[in-house]
Amino acid sequence: MATDTAVTGAPETMQLRLASGNGPVTRTVLRTPLRDALPSEVPLIDISPIFSTSVADRKAVACKIHDAATNIGFFYIQNHRVPSRDTDMAYSASLDFFRQDMEAKMKADAKKGPFDSGYRGPGTQRVNPDEGADLRETYSILYDPMLDPTVPDPARIPEPASRFLHLGRAPFESTDTLPHFKDAFVRYFQACLALARALTRTFALSLDLPESAFDSKVQYPDASLEINFYPPISTGHAVSAPADPDTRVSIGSHTDFLLFTILWQDSNGGLQVLNREGQWIRASPVEGTFVVNIGDYLQRITNDKYVSTVHRAQNWSGRQRVSMPFFWGFGMHESCQVLESCCGEDGKSKYDEVRCVDWVSRRLGNLFDLSDKG
């Protein structure tokens, strides 16, 4: 359980339990008022030069991303080439889906669908056992090569990659009450695919590697798109049993599993990041941007040089909130050891090589272990 500590002349603290790829860990959190992130804490990076023909321009952005990834693990990106029309359509379709009656939404129940993709209702998820149940509904799909414009013939994908892929299994047939939903979702998913691959090359540059270093590892990626629908938190909400405001969460405190996440959020806000001092800070919406955050696997292969930072969401806006995270990682059939460029002068790596499928299994297993101990 989370415990409080009072020190004379210093802010009160609490210990927050978290799941990780190495088992349960704790973070010391200051009980200080929530505040807005400073520009130096969650920087805004113009990534338009990553599309330039100039290597120097691309490296300049990579340097900025390197700084953000080592200091906080969160940053905004602008001029990302994802059309606003695509985000607007996906946002509108998401609202249309979640505002349906429960019977219509349950046609896409993730428990009935393939590979747990589809809809999850309110009160059915709890990311962190020291906090309340997540006050959200979600709809998600996994990477499907049939939705990937870079894959000319999904039926000819070789082993072992094909073993982990799910062709034509996105649960769109269960959303036929909204004919526009599939088109909006697919367009946005494809835009995120293109952006994620471009950012992967920039991350390679940021680590003093050739831009193409990770290209083959994301040819058939482990990727998913999730739409989160957050009702406003209220003290009388049926799911928010704990009395401590810190435990009432739209999504509980956690880190992400994979390489990085690309997050679109609406104007209502609610995303909070735990900074290095142990303070919760707001990563408020900035129009026309995405938030990018480092995941656990990227922290691992960089020997902890890049930081996978704890974050959560609390929707105190009084309005319905939507966020659309796109989770991005190497293909499940791939593996990666600590990068040589991250081992330092002594050449030591903190971690062994691990297959991505084993990493995800371990990460999920540790999450469930932590929940069971709550």
From Swiss-Prot:
Domain Fe2OG dioxygenase: 220-330
Pathway noted in the entry: Secondary metabolite biosynthesis
One of the GO biological process terms: small molecule biosynthetic process
Keywords, ordered alphabetically: Dioxygenase, Iron, Metal-binding, Oxidoreductase
Enzyme nomenclature, EC number: 1.14.11.-
Any GO MF annotation of the entry: dioxygenase activity
Metal-binding keyword on record: yes
Binding site for 2-oxoglutarate: 321
A Pfam cross-reference name: 2OG-FeII_Oxy
Disordered as annotated region, ranges: 111-131
PROSITE patterns on file: FE2OG_OXY (PS51471)
Cofactor: how bound: Binds 1 Fe(2+) ion per subunit.
Catalytic activity: peramine + 2-oxoglutarate + O2 = 8-hydroxyperamine + succinate + CO2
Positions of Fe cation binding: 254, 256, 311
Cofactor(s) it depends on: Fe(2+)
Keyword rRNA-binding appears in the UniProt entry: no
InterPro entries tied to this protein: DIOX_N (IPR026992), IPNS-like_FE2OG_OXY (IPR044861), IPNS-like_sf (IPR027443), Iron_ascorbate_oxido_reductase (IPR050231), Oxoglu/Fe-dep_dioxygenase_dom (IPR005123)
Similarity comment: Belongs to the iron/ascorbate-dependent oxidoreductase family.
Described purpose of this protein according to its UniProt entry: 2-oxoglutarate-Fe(II) type oxidoreductase; part of the gene cluster that mediates the biosynthesis of pyrrolopyrazines, secondary metabolites showing insecticidal activity. Within the pathway, ppzC uses peramine as substrate for hydroxylation to yield the novel analog 8-hydroxyperamine. The single multifunctional NRPS ppzA is sufficient to produce peramine via condensation of 1-pyrroline-5-carboxylate and arginine, N-methylation of the alpha-amino group of arginine and reduction of the thioester and the cyclization to form an iminium ion resulting in release from the peptide synthetase.
Name this protein carries in UniProt: 2-oxoglutarate-Fe(II) type oxidoreductase ppzC
Annotated source species: Metarhizium majus (strain ARSEF 297)
